[in-house]
Amino acid sequence: MSDFGADHAFAGAASKLKEHYGIAVPVSAVRGFTEEHGAAMLAQEKQKSDWPNHAGVPVLITEMDGSMLPVVEVAEPVLGEARRDRRKTRQVSWKEARLALVHPPGSVTPRFGATLGSVEEAGERLAVCAWEAGAGSQTKFHGVGDGAVWITEQMEAQFGTQAQYLVDFYHLCEYLSAAGEVIAGNDKPAWMEKKKKWLKDNRWKDVLGTLRPYLEPANIPEPAAPVRACFRYISNHVNFLDYKGALAAGLPIGSGEIESAHRYVFQNRLKIAGGWWKVENLKKMIALRVLRANGGWADYWSKVHQEAA
């Protein structure tokens, strides 16, 4: 039942139970059973512990990012208050869910961690993933992403001097492309290729030098100042632009892996039309989806059956 509920809207899961097994189950029962086991999986999540003393694997690739998921709040009944239609008290909004992944170079089975909580909690989930992926006292961590401050700060907080971070090359190139429209016009394709080669050779100072003469005046609003935006983005991330070193080491310079993971871990189930979640239930479903993505589904149910025996 929870297998279907993990992948399909609860009404659809009930229909599949009827279709495949000839069992008629109320939608509320599917929801309750699925969320019950999601809560158990959430409670079983490993917590951050002291870093292991052994050397660990040489290198781990780490990525972390957030995406918005739909949440709903409904006013709770007040003792002594006249009965009312609580549906009229619904307030819908969006809440950021942070997803982390870690794996050795060449691996296609990352360890995932996720939270609806603070950036510090997200960092702890990242650290747990690293530990599960074989991290140790000598492991080097190669982080890649959009350069958000909360991510770079957590990389440093969790891994210290063992970590290096790289701004997603393709994300930076989006800024560069917008600037190229202004600077190069019809010659933009050739201009872009040249600047990409410079960046991959760590010649970001030369890129800034090319942008500088075209910087828009300060009184030009941000949406109309793509050169200034690109110049600022590069200037703010100069410590995270070692593309030459990453390429030489055979390490990724793009973070498409975490972007794809948001779709198949979170969004395919938790961001569907008409689906709004209470925060406490969303936490359970996230834990359930992460456990499945980590390949822990069979082990979980084996333990459940052993305890029931």
Give residue ranges: language-model regions.
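Catalytic center-proximal scaffold of phosphoryl-transfer enzymes
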Residues: 1-309
